[in-house]
Regions:
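Adenosine-nucleotide cofactor-binding segment
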Residues: 94, 110-169
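Short helix-loop-beta connector
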Residues: 28, 59-62, 85-91, 155-156
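C-terminal capping/lid region of NAD(P)-dependent oxidoreductase domains
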Residues: 235-244, 252-271
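Glycine-rich phosphate-binding loop and adjacent beta-alpha segment
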Residues: 112, 168-238, 271
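A structural motif shared across PLP-dependent enzymes of the aminotransferase-like
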Residues: 37-51
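Glycine-rich beta-strand-centered segment in the early N-terminal region that forms part
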Residues: 1-41
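Hydrophobic/small residue at the entry helix of a nucleotide-binding pocket
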Residues: 101
C-alpha cells in the first residue's frame, strides 16, 4: 500500500477527543474514541481525524485493547460476516493463523462454531494458534498445504480460504478450495499475486480482494463493524493479544520485526 511521502503512517489508534471542528456533531472534547479507517497518521501524539472515520469507544473496551484490535478486529468482522457469511459447522482455511489478524480470527471462529485449519511457520506459532482456537495447524515450511487440507477434510476440501500472505500461498489456496468455494485474498505479506487467468478458477471458484477501507466508506457499515467487534470484546469471546509495547520512537524497529515475521499478535506503540 504505497503512500505519498513525506507523510504520517499508522492506521489504527485510540484516545480522547481534545477538540472538534465547528461542523462536527456527535463528538465532544473528552469523548473516548477509536479508529482504523481513515487518513494515516496514527504514529503521533496528536492526530487530526475526520469525524466520519472515528467511532465512540464503549467504557467496557480499554484504550490498549482498542488500539490493538480496531483494524485487525474489524477486518475479521467483515471477512466472517460480510465477504463470506460463515455458518456454524463449516471448516475454513486461514493462513498466518498466529499473526495479528489470525489470532483474532481464531477466537472469533471458535465463538461462531467454525472449524479452522490454520497455517503457521513454526511449532511455536502453531501452538499459539491452537491456544486461541485453531483446530488444525499446518506447518507450511515442512508440510504440503493442499495434501494436509485434503487429509483433514477427508477429501472434501474447504468452502472458504482466507489468505493474507499472497504470492507464496495463492496457488495452494486455490487448490484447497472445494467446488464453488471462495478465495478471499485480503493481503500480500509475501508479495503481490501475479495476474491470474480466469481458467485457474476451475469453472466454479470465486475470487475476491476485499479491503477494510472499501467496506468502511459508508458510515453505517463502519459503525456496524465496530459495534460487532466491541460486542465480541465486551462478551469476552475475543480479547487482544498484545505481544509487546514499544515507545513510538522505536517504530522503525517494530516495522523491521513485522517484516521479518518475528512477531505474533499485536505490537503497541505508545507516544
Amino acid at each position: 500500500y504505497p503512500m505519498p511521502l513525506p507523510g504520517g503512517i499508522g492506521m489504527e489508534g485510540a484516545g480522547v477527543v481534545e477538540e472538534v471542528g465547528p461542523d462536527v456533531t456527535g463528538f465532544a472534547p473528552g469523548d473516548r474514541v477509536a479508529y482504523a479507517a481513515g487518513p494515516p497518521g496514527a504514529y503521533a501524539q496528536v492526530h487530526n481525524m475526520p469525524a466520519r472515520s472515528v467511532v465512540a469507544l464503549p467504557e467496557a473496551v480499554g484504550f490498549e485493547a482498542a488500539a490493538a484490535l480496531m483494524l485487525k478486529g474489524m477486518t475479521v468482522q467483515y471477512l466472517f460476516n460480510r465477504t463470506v457469511r460463515l455458518e456454524p459447522g463449516q471448516t475454513i482455511l486461514f493462513h498466518a493463523a498466529a499473526g495479528g489478524v489470525g489470532l483474532i480470527a481464531m477466537q472469533w471462529a471458535r465463538a461462531m462454531g467454525v472449524t479452522v485449519i490454520g497455517t503457521a511457520g513454526s511449532e511455536e506459532k502453531a501452538e499459539l494458534a491452537r491456544r486461541h482456537g485453531c483446530d488444525h495447524v499446518i506447518l507450511y515450511r515442512s508440510e504440503d498445504i493442499v495434501e494436509r487440507v485434503r487429509e483433514i477434510t477427508q477429501g472434501a476440501m474447504v468452502p472458504v480460504v482466507y489468505d493474507s500472505v499472497g504470492k507464496d500461498t495463492f496457488d495452494a489456496s486455490l487448490a484447497a478450495l472445494a467446488p464453488f468455494g471462495t478465495m478471499v485474498c485480503f493481503g500480500a505479506s509475501s508479495g503481490p499475486v501475479p495476474p491470474v487467468p480466469l481458467t485457474a478458477l476451475r469453472g466454479t471458484l470465486y475470487l475476491t480482494r476485499p479491503s477494510l477501507l472499501a467496506y468502511a466508506e459508508r458510515r453505517e457499515i463502519l459503525e456496524s463493524m465496530a459495534g460487532g467487534l466491541f460486542e465480541m470484546v465486551g462478551s469476552g469471546k475475543v480479547r487482544p493479544i498484545i505481544e509487546r509495547r514499544m515507545p513510538l520512537a522505536e517504530a522503525a524497529q517494530a516495522h523491521s520485526d513485522l517484516e521479518a515475521r518475528r512477531t505474533t499478535g499485536a505490537t503497541l506503540l505508545q507516544p
